[in-house]
Regions:
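Conserved ATP-binding subdomain of kinase catalytic cores across diverse folds
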Residues: 133-292
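Middle-to-C-terminal accessory/interaction subdomains
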Residues: 80-85, 89-95, 100-129, 137-138, ...
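Short, Lys/Arg-enriched N-terminal segments with co-localized hydrophobic residues
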Residues: 18-43
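Sec-dependent signal peptide cleavage junction
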Residues: 64-73
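N-terminal Sec-pathway targeting helices
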Residues: 43-55
Length: 510
């Protein structure tokens, strides 16, 4: 990375070598004393001289590393500690605030690479996808005390579809061997204990990328929409619902706002989560990618999925041989779960927009069976108004538009019963007022202070302005923490009221 400093190849094992130098030097001085029998005073003076050099070395060392703590006494943690010295903005970042409520992410890159008029990632290439929309960075992640958790070279992309136009953008941070030969993966668990979902429950100790999801209007207007949604989904039985971690994000030392970190939803991420050996065995496609961005990056996978959709929508769902074919190509239970939880979350940006599916080659292992499965993602617009909740239910259960397969599945009486049973069970497990209130309390406790800081920062205009083409802000556009509290109360009330609306739809027949 020619425009960034290179990380050193050594770690804090250097302190051990300083100590060894002290011992060896002391012995050397004693053995080479002018007298065959050196006096105690001479020996002490020689040792003190060497000891002074040792102390000076330590002072120089720790002046570089800013007296930060080491995350744990392991070679990996010591190396991260030593690399964190190369975050030239860290001192100013930590001096700018009395405390941090969550993680701190510091990104360094050449300013022209990010903001150049012709080729800047954030100024000119924010609609580019793939490697064309990626630039080299150095990324540092710290905990609240300033302990470095991640320090390495990586790639940066804009995350999202139409939201790429927003002033405040979301990012995907990607580890690659070409950027950092010593660290081709991230190795610190930012989500406190993720494990594989294949039944082995192995700790996920390495991963290829993570998302920095921005908090802004008019998307995740409260700052907790996504975290509340994913937390409720996990309680409802959606095992792959993303964990979220609040963070303050800085680029070249400048505060960008309140964000939260979450695992990526890519073929690499699926391989890590489901313990799939070869990511090449995985097929992932965003069904409406072309409608949202103008291009479809995986047309052959989309064609395969739409062939299955066409088969399903025209199948006789009472024929046992047809059911066998369906179940060989679709994880029906997971599909019904996916629809049920989206309806209970009141997701208003889903059926005709955020639809992503995946499957893995049949390797005879859990989740490696050739069956299509659905992603739960992008929960910015959950907690919809009553009318939209009812409309969503009717569209999801009755209309085949937008490649919707639920109506076809519900033609099978057993699937229909399973679907309604899932809704009732989810309501009991996750969507009672008590559970909803506990989730809100937890997520707000984690995010409140960072959002409060954000609202007082220069980055706040990025929170308010959705598009780079937005009109200049006026006084009426600004919101306060009191306004945000009203939004949170509305959000909470919509979620609490949704189960009764869904139950009424079920009772009226569908």
């Amino acid at each position: 990375m020619s425009h960034l400093q290179s990380f050193p190849a050594f770690s804090l094992n250097f302190t051990f070598y300083l100590y060894k130098i002290y011992i060896i030097s002391s012995e050397f001085c004693i053995c080479n004393s002018e007298s065959d029998q050196p006096t105690k005073d001479k020996i002490m003076k020689q040792k003190l001289s060497v000891f002074s050099l040792l102390i000076l070395s330590f002072v120089l060392l720790f002046s570089c590393f800013g007296f930060r703590r080491i995350a744990s006494d392991t070679p990996e943690a010591r190396e991260v500690y030593s690399r964190a010295a190369y975050d030239t903005y860290a001192e100013d970042i930590f001096a700018s605030r009395e405390s941090f409520p969550g993680l701190i992410v510091s990104i360094q890159a050449d300013n022209d690479t990010l903001y150049g008029e012709e080729n800047g990632l954030l100024s000119a290439r924010y609609m580019c996808s793939g490697r064309e929309g990626e630039c080299e960075i150095q990324v540092f992640v710290y905990d609240q005390s300033g302990t470095p958790l991640i320090a390495q070279n990586a790639g940066l992309r804009i995350s999202g579809a139409t939201s790429r136009n927003a002033i405040r953008k979301s990012f995907r941070v990607i580890a690659r061997k070409e950027y950092d030969k010593q660290h081709p993966k991230f190795t610190y668990d930012l989500w406190n204990g993720r494990t594989t979902l294949d039944g082995a429950t192995k700790p996920i100790q390495e991963y290829s990328s993570f998302i920095l999801h921005s908090v802004r209007l008019a998307m995740d207007s409260t700052g907790i929409h996504n975290s509340v949604g994913y937390s409720l989904a996990r309680k409802a039985g959606i095992v792959d619902a993303s964990p979220t971690t609040p963070a303050a994000v800085y680029i070249n030392g400048k505060y960008q706002g309140a964000y939260f970190l979450m695992p990526a939803k890519t073929d690499n991420a699926l391989a890590e989560l489901y313990n799939i050996e070869k990511k090449e065995d995985i097929e992932v496609v965003s069904v409406f990618e072309e409608e949202k961005t103008g291009t479809q990056s995986r047309p052959e996978i989309l064609a395969s999925y739409l062939t299955f959709v066409d088969f399903l929508q025209n199948a006789d769902m009472t024929d046992p041989s047809v059911i066998k074919q369906v179940e060989a190509q679709l994880d029906v239970h997971q599909c019904l779960q996916y629809y049920a939880v989206n309806l209970l979350l009141g997701n208003g940006d889903w059926l005709d927009n955020n639809l992503r599916v995946w499957r893995c080659k049949d390797n005879g292992l859990p989740y490696q069976d050739g069956k299509w499965r659905f992603f739960l993602f992008d929960l910015d617009w959950i907690g919809s108004f009553s009318d939209l909740v009812v409309m969503n239910f009717e569209q999801a259960t009755q209309s085949a538009n937008y490649h919707n397969i639920l109506p076809a599945l519900l033609k099978n009486p057993e699937y229909k019963k399973e679907f309604t049973d899932l809704i009732y069970q989810m309501e009991e497990d996750a969507f009672t007022p008590e559970v909803i209130d506990s989730v809100f309390a937890k997520e707000e406790e984690q995010m409140h202070d960072e959002v409060a800081y954000d609202f007082q920062s220069e980055a706040f205009t990025g929170y308010l302005m959705y598009s780079v083409n937005s009109s200049p802000l006026e006084e009426k556009d600004y919101i306060t923490m009191e306004d945000r509290q009203i939004l949170i109360e509305d959000f909470r009330n919509h979620l609490v009221n949704t189960p009764a609306l869904i139950n009424n739809c079920i009772e009226n027949g569908f």
